[in-house]
């Protein structure tokens, strides 16, 4: 089976924060899991280097957009690597090959009549002497009345035209813009209404928020969307006479999944088409603000271009708040990953964002809960079980796994876990999958306690060997089951047990296997850091 996983492309206009990672992490877990099963996986993403957020930052800093985008692209790559993201290709939109792929799709759609030119009205700032694309404008949402940018409302999820905003103002100078005529290229999205409705009706793996929002758009009637902007930064429209126009960043970005796949193919020699056919298992992983671009825009572009892949699974996470408040990068109300990774283990971050993440509803990050989950679950449950078992072997068996008899009921339980957890992962019920594993970890600790090996090692040596041998097999299989979620600590424990690589099936470590140097898996985090971290944020 071929499995394609596309992770949303973060804007390269600032550092990655926990909100980004909360929505993107499911992609890495899926990729690691399917590889363990032996499936062929292509997992791609990249930095979105175009669009108004980067152009605006560049203007503020007096730099070129390319310098800003490249700075954060390089930082993103380092951050994702430190967090254990296992992309097969992490690329960027500021890439000549990507430009070629996007332009070729645009030409094909234009030739087929799915893209057309149209005179339209657009906001123009007389003071700045330029047209104002979407994010260059701020105003009142005509649907819900909140202050929003000119392309999309994050409050009611409406797609907006800048001219529809009330109390409009230019984000560069603050003045009120006027309306001028201009010409743009449009995607005939309305032509795909019936096909997109069928796609929605036949979905079997979209999250509820994706189904509800996409249904709303289709029932309200799909509107043709402008696919160009008056900018000097981005992918050029491939037609003469329109040199000042660039392709809308979200058309550009979602076609990045295709260009990243083709780029991967060029580097590896593997055919990209294997992951873009109708029978490919696909997962698109992103936040709920990106839903319409993945459930409506992307399928329309692919269908129009004659590409048969469909978004089978839409993994659209809800929002993450920080200490009970909405995350805001402009107010620096965020937890930035480059800073967090200096002080905390990547597996601690990964664990928290799955077990407490915004999988199906908004969730909250607090420093108190984060440190509690590390000390209570990773250290207190999992780390404790691994440490107490392996230290016992070092103390009483000279570091050699004893020749004991495996508890058959526990073996059956482990074998069942592979199927049960795998099924939940494939359905993207990741929180529940991890809960099931940690429930088993707690059962393993109870088993150790009830068997009392510290007593039987003196009074019933055979029973003690059976207990410890069984505990070793529990640990060995936990390294497999937890590998998609906690890759760093799983690798470390495999090193303790001399296990070569993970697998998604029951394994046993042989008696007399020599333990490598056993270390503490998760050091305790000082609770005083809760206050320090909250003060850094500015929490009273």
From Swiss-Prot:
<feature type="binding site">
    <location>
        <position position="144"/>
    </location>
    <ligand>
        <name>Zn(2+)</name>
    </ligand>
</feature>
<keyword id="KW-0030">Aminoacyl-tRNA synthetase</keyword>
<dbReference type="InterPro" id="IPR015413">
    <property type="entry name" value="Methionyl/Leucyl_tRNA_Synth"/>
</dbReference>
<feature type="short sequence motif" description="'KMSKS' region">
    <location>
        <begin position="326"/>
        <end position="330"/>
    </location>
</feature>
<keyword id="KW-0436">Ligase</keyword>
<dbReference type="GO" id="GO:0005524">
    <property type="term" value="F:ATP binding"/>
</dbReference>
<feature type="binding site">
    <location>
        <position position="141"/>
    </location>
    <ligand>
        <name>Zn(2+)</name>
    </ligand>
</feature>
<dbReference type="GO" id="GO:0006431">
    <property type="term" value="P:methionyl-tRNA aminoacylation"/>
</dbReference>
<dbReference type="Pfam" id="PF19303">
    <property type="entry name" value="Anticodon_3"/>
</dbReference>
<dbReference type="InterPro" id="IPR033911">
    <property type="entry name" value="MetRS_core"/>
</dbReference>
<keyword id="KW-0963">Cytoplasm</keyword>
<dbReference type="InterPro" id="IPR023458">
    <property type="entry name" value="Met-tRNA_ligase_1"/>
</dbReference>
<dbReference type="InterPro" id="IPR014758">
    <property type="entry name" value="Met-tRNA_synth"/>
</dbReference>
<dbReference type="InterPro" id="IPR014729">
    <property type="entry name" value="Rossmann-like_a/b/a_fold"/>
</dbReference>
<protein>
    <recommendedName>
        <fullName>Methionine--tRNA ligase</fullName>
        <ecNumber>6.1.1.10</ecNumber>
    </recommendedName>
</protein>
<feature type="binding site">
    <location>
        <position position="329"/>
    </location>
    <ligand>
        <name>ATP</name>
    </ligand>
</feature>
<dbReference type="GO" id="GO:0005829">
    <property type="term" value="C:cytosol"/>
</dbReference>
<dbReference type="InterPro" id="IPR001412">
    <property type="entry name" value="aa-tRNA-synth_I_CS"/>
</dbReference>
<dbReference type="InterPro" id="IPR041872">
    <property type="entry name" value="Anticodon_Met"/>
</dbReference>
<dbReference type="Pfam" id="PF09334">
    <property type="entry name" value="tRNA-synt_1g"/>
</dbReference>
<keyword id="KW-0067">ATP-binding</keyword>
<dbReference type="InterPro" id="IPR029038">
    <property type="entry name" value="MetRS_Zn"/>
</dbReference>
<keyword id="KW-0479">Metal-binding</keyword>
<keyword id="KW-0648">Protein biosynthesis</keyword>
<feature type="short sequence motif" description="'HIGH' region">
    <location>
        <begin position="10"/>
        <end position="20"/>
    </location>
</feature>
<feature type="binding site">
    <location>
        <position position="153"/>
    </location>
    <ligand>
        <name>Zn(2+)</name>
    </ligand>
</feature>
<comment type="similarity">
    <text>Belongs to the class-I aminoacyl-tRNA synthetase family. MetG type 1 subfamily.</text>
</comment>
<keyword id="KW-0862">Zinc</keyword>
<dbReference type="InterPro" id="IPR009080">
    <property type="entry name" value="tRNAsynth_Ia_anticodon-bd"/>
</dbReference>
<dbReference type="GO" id="GO:0004825">
    <property type="term" value="F:methionine-tRNA ligase activity"/>
</dbReference>
<comment type="subunit">
    <text>Monomer.</text>
</comment>
<keyword id="KW-0547">Nucleotide-binding</keyword>
<feature type="binding site">
    <location>
        <position position="156"/>
    </location>
    <ligand>
        <name>Zn(2+)</name>
    </ligand>
</feature>
<dbReference type="GO" id="GO:0046872">
    <property type="term" value="F:metal ion binding"/>
</dbReference>
<comment type="function">
    <text>Is required not only for elongation of protein synthesis but also for the initiation of all mRNA translation through initiator tRNA(fMet) aminoacylation.</text>
</comment>
